[in-house]
Amino acid sequence: MQYSWAFPFPMHKLFPLEMGLPPAYPEKEMTSMNAPEPYRVLFVCLGNICRSPAAEIIFKKMVAEQGLEHLVESDSAGMIGYHRGCPPDSRMLTALKKYGYEDPGLKSRPVRKEDLEQFDLIVGMDRENLRDLKRLDEKGQWTGKIVPMCFFTTRFPDEEVPDPYYGG
């Protein structure tokens, strides 16, 4: 089966409310400008050099196309820190470029415990990522935020996003 990085990310699943507003929008704290804090989405894979940066790049473009940059922020991280500070894999960037996505200069970083609290939605690429994220949440207070990436895909029947770094 052939995979592309341009997986369809249906915004209506992530933002089901009218006008595309995030589900937690009404509950977010207000800032000094009387506007809600942005809804924060974190994409997570093993090393943060292929799948999660690709998801972040695609998602940011989709958010911008919807005019929601002021309401939605995203980031990506890896379960391991081996590639900390490294740019995304060049093969992944080449694949994204074929679909019209630009390299924004991302650098790999590991997931931090505080990410579980700071992000409104944490999207894991595979079962191992989901398991490890839930283990990081020792008290189980953030597990409702942790969801699989394939929850949002419609083109592929898979339950996880294969890791292309290792030939997936």
Tell what function each PLM region has.
Residues 25-26, 31-118:
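Conserved active-site segments centered on acidic
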